[in-house]
């Protein structure tokens, strides 16, 4: 029998339909590319590219796009045993516009409801979730039932499992206001608080950390996340780089990489997969954060998200090149 997986992620999956032309608004785009999408799915792909055994817990529609998701996961080396079909809803599709360096509007088609929000608690393989070395969940998974209860059930099962063999339980704060009733952060905060009580790592940008904590300054955000129960808080500050703070007060600040941005949408997911890779390797915060930051920078310089995830040698090469500058 195979041992525990390195990483199980839970949450969104879909198909990204991205323009193959940059600087062109959607009404004028003539050519598009089709890519596997969904943040936790991309995180699993990113970690698989780095040599980790990964799987995703999610749902697709029973349609050709759902078939594509299964096919793409297998091609990326991600275990799809917990990716099942839902008859009632179509596989989500996401369009974007690409205006480098920092304007990438997203258009989500997840109505009447996304299949990944109808994961039920009784469907979960709780022994596998508990045994996984890293478990990754997202804020979007908390936005609606039954996904909300399923996500919190998975977190509670890991916490009750005594953490034997576990490396980390990661909460990607992942704030998408369009998925929440009224887009109100106050409505999300109690559920974020419940998830943080079981997580050991929290990661998000300053705005997402603000939703979780009510704070707006990066250091205050990190301190509030630690007070909420996590052992490591990672705050992504955009052009100001990344701040990582541990429960013992150890603080690491990493500057951003100087890259020519093509599409910034996949950078955070590459960061997440690389973060999991470093956690699994037992790296100290500075090495962990530098590696994850470099992985995100590489993907920001590429068009796709899942297909753009870097291999370890590419990340190492970027870090080595910058070390000699």
Predicted region positions:
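Flexible, glycine/proline-enriched loop segments at strand-loop-helix junctions
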Residues: 109-110, 134-146, 176-182
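Active-site beta-loop-alpha junctions enriched in small/polar residues
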Residues: 111, 140, 174-178, 207, ...
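Conserved phosphate-binding/catalytic region of the ribokinase-like
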Residues: 1-8, 156-157, 214-325
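Hydrophobic faces of well-ordered beta-strands that scaffold small-molecule active sites
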Residues: 169-171, 202
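Conserved N-terminal subdomain of the carbohydrate kinase-like
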Residues: 53-139, 164-166, 317-325
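Glycine-rich phosphate/adenosyl-contacting loop at the front of the ribokinase-like
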Residues: 1-79, 119-120, 260-262, 325
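Active-site metal-binding loops of divalent metal-dependent hydrolases
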Residues: 13, 140, 173, 270
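Conserved phosphate/ATP/ADP-binding segment of small-molecule kinases
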Residues: 163-164, 177-251
């Amino acid at each position: 029998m195979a041992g525990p997986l390195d990483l199980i992620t839970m949450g969104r999956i879909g198909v990204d339909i991205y323009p193959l032309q940059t600087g062109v608004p959607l009404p004028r785009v003539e050519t598009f590319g089709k890519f596997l999408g969904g943040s936790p799915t991309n995180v699993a792909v990113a970690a698989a590219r780095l040599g980790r055994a990964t799987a995703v817990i999610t749902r697709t529609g029973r349609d050709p796009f759902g078939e594509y998701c299964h096919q793409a996961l297998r091609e990326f080396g991600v275990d799809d045993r917990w990716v099942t079909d839902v008859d009632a809803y179509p596989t989500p599709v996401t369009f974007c516009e690409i205006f480098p360096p920092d304007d990438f509007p997203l258009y989500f088609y997840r109505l009447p409801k996304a299949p990944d929000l109808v994961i039920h608690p009784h469907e979960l393989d709780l022994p596998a979730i508990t045994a996984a070395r890293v478990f990754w969940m997202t804020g979007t998974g908390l936005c609606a039932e039954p996904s909300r209860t399923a996500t919190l059930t998975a977190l509670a099962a890991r916490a009750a499992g005594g953490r034997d063999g576990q490396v980390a339980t990661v909460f990607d704060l992942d704030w998408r206001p369009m998925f929440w009733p009224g887009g109100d952060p106050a409505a999300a905060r109690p559920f974020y608080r419940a998830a943080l009580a079981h997580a050991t790592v929290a990661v998000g940008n300053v705005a997402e950390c603000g939703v979780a904590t009510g704070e707006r300054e990066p250091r205050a955000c990190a301190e509030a996340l630690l007070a909420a129960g996590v052992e490591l808080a990672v705050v992504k500050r955009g052009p100001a780089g990344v701040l990582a703070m541990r429960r013992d007060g150890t603080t690491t600040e990493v500057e951003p990489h100087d890259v020519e941005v093509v599409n910034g949408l996949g950078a955070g997911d590459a960061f997440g997969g690389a973060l999991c890779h470093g956690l699994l390797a037992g790296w100290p915060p500075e090495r962990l954060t530098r590696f994850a930051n470099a992985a995100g920078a590489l993907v920001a310089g590429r068009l796709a998200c899942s297909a753009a995830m870097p291999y370890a040698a590419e990340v190492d090469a970027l870090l080595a090149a910058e070390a000699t500058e």
